[in-house]
Regions:
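Aromatic- and Gly/Pro-enriched helix-to-coil junctions and flexible linker segments
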Residues: 1-205
Length: 205
């Protein structure tokens, strides 16, 4: 089942077909998706994004087979406070800000250094909230935070524009800053990662 409780949450569907030889193939992009209940939508790549509270059903069809998955959505339209470890740091990584070619390099970039790929949350939170008199994370006026102004290229930024005002990533950072730019050290951390299918068939390289 799919149970999502925040507007920024989503679910990635993966459909695996078992072949005659015993190997597996990822057929997610070949599946026909339908959503009942008007609670969200599914992209051709199987990414489910919620749009309304309620219960529904996600149906996948492939090669004459059919599978239904119950869906329950809540929290749409309600305020939420993004978590630094779970929500903000992954966005910073996705945008490339803490990469080795940017602020995650040994000496940082333009006087601003982050831990490489966000491995040290305490170091990063201090870099965002303590340095430069907290100008990088302006809790009084989040939109004036250098963290957002640089990323959206509202002010000169050597790395160019990596997000836009109003975008999902921009809003996650803005809401986090507006809620006080805090770090919760008790946030659950990722313990392991699994790849599916485990024995894939590669048709082209």
């Amino acid at each position: 089942s799919i149970v999502l409780g925040r507007s920024i949450d989503y679910a990635q569907m993966i459909v695996t077909a078992k072949l005659e030889g015993g190997s597996e193939a990822d057929v997610t992009r070949m599946v026909e998706w339908t959503v009942q209940g008007e609670v969200g939508s599914v992209s051709p790549r199987g990414l489910f994004v919620p749009s309304a509270n309620g219960k529904g059903k996600l149906t996948a069809r492939f090669a004459g087979l059919r599978l239904e998955v119950p869906v329950e959505i809540s929290g749409i339209g309600s305020g939420y406070v993004p978590d630094f470890v779970r929500d903000v740091n992954p966005v910073v990584t996705k945008l490339g800000c803490n990469a080795g070619t940017c602020h995650g390099s040994k000496d940082g970039r333009e006087g601003f250094k982050l831990s490489l790929r966000g491995y040290d949350a305490i170091f990063d939170i201090r870099a965002f909230t303590d340095d430069m008199a907290s100008r990088r994370a302006n809790v009084a006026v989040p939109e004036k935070s250098l963290m957002l102004q640089k990323a959206s290229a509202s002010v000169p930024h050597e790395g160019g524009q990596v997000t836009k005002p109003g975008s999902k990533y921009y809003e996650i950072i803005r809401n986090w800053i507006g809620a006080g730019a805090k770090l919760d050290l008790k946030t659950a951390r990722v313990e392991s990662i699994e790849l599916f299918p485990k024995n894939p068939v590669v048709q082209e390289i």
